[in-house]
């Protein structure tokens, strides 16, 4: 029997000397703004992607110039928590070392930079390192940034859950010294074949990206069921005692390929808090050993569980931990939105959640958002918490400092603008012009599109009710569109697939309703559906639930069988 042919990335990882490749040589080459094709895959493990300005592609081609290459660098910030001092450093880098001059808050509670020339990469990574920040494993076939509910009201429980998110992030880091050697000028370590450099990942790391989240009920802003691995906090008398573990979620799919599909995670049962790291490592190593390394489109954990079966996967995790799952505990999974404005925590400190449109922290006409956050960071004594809805929380504000913080926020346009429930619950990915995978606009177009949807809600008399709407430029699902009540996924310039029927809480996927349609058709469909919804809805019924109950779309129960069916 012939040996299975692995995906190209598997050979690249094997031959990379634990993620070193020829990155250093590429960094030293000034003749091009790009890295080699192989190194473009390896640099993801170091936290960045090679991109180019797609708005300028044709113009530069006519001028016989190479594309305007730049890099997107994403930081690793477990749970989205950083200090004001760190924020000031992050802001300084954005202002001085990137062409975008902005900070992009992501849907996974971290920040990323766009428009970094190759010559600035090392400086940025070293500047971040001085503030105890890094981009290790923010991308690539490893455990990515670990999410955790900011939950500013339940401060004590949040801190306990956050501590586990931080441990998960730190313990699942790659052990290779390639990052330190290349970017921080650490001395090169000589490795031999016999050394166990990566005790968890092994020489070829994971088959594909791996995403974790820690949820603190009733909040589900981290969309815990969309992750490869999720831990839902269980508390007794306000103290964290354990987690319900879920596994096998993921949003990515490919247009036209029915073997690919988004999926929500399965519930596996309750585990004690002290066993969290054991179970995380067990799930990751089962995926390492069982995952598909031949076809990267089918490499995520969700496909591994579908292929081998829930029971077999569960048994293998229990075997590797030596611990049986207990029956899952009852918890309430609720809102996925953020609590905007001031909220007081159990520690009597105050927390201010600020809405950041599209997660883009930038000075705009009449809204100098970036300057405002910079000025707040100069006087704030607590911390900054980035949310998975691309917003930011000024957390831990003593009552005596509230007025000063609010004055700065209002002065710089960070407060005072009315945010509808729908806009406050909705997110979009970056897409054009920098993302190489984007087929249509998202971040640049989404605010105007939402304004038109809000007008329809107002027309039908339910603008006070939130609908979770999400838009992505492609089906890879960075903004989790398949878990939105209204999901719009780019198909071509100006054209989107329209998905309906996810639950408001994120416990059911949506389903394709109309394919490859333009804005006018999308709005016409929503206008008609909103009219029906207002006339036919039951008391308290959300829009997503209505579209399923009324038969507009059928419920997705088992994504492998019925997402495309």
Swiss-Prot record:
[4Fe-4S] cluster binds at residues 429, 435, 474, 478. GO terms for molecular function: 4 iron, 4 sulfur cluster binding; heme binding; metal ion binding; NADP binding; sulfite reductase (ferredoxin) activity; sulfite reductase (NADPH) activity. Component of the sulfite reductase complex that catalyzes the 6-electron reduction of sulfite to sulfide. This is one of several activities required for the biosynthesis of L-cysteine from sulfate. It comes from Shewanella piezotolerans (strain WP3 / JCM 13877). InterPro entries: CysI (IPR011786), NiRdtase/SiRdtase_haem-b_fer (IPR005117), Nit/Sulf_reduc_fer-like_dom_sf (IPR036136), NO2/SO3_Rdtase_4Fe4S_dom (IPR006067), NO2/SO3_Rdtase_4Fe4S_prot (IPR045169), NO2/SO3_Rdtase_4Fe4S_sf (IPR045854), NO2/SO3_Rdtase_FeS/sirohaem_BS (IPR006066). HAMAP family: CysI. Keywords: 4Fe-4S, Amino-acid biosynthesis, Cysteine biosynthesis, Heme, Iron, Iron-sulfur, Metal-binding, NADP, Oxidoreductase. Its EC number is 1.8.1.2. This is Sulfite reductase [NADPH] hemoprotein beta-component. Pathway: Sulfur metabolism; hydrogen sulfide biosynthesis; hydrogen sulfide from sulfite (NADPH route): step 1/1. The keyword Transport does not apply. It catalyses: hydrogen sulfide + 3 NADP(+) + 3 H2O = sulfite + 3 NADPH + 4 H(+).
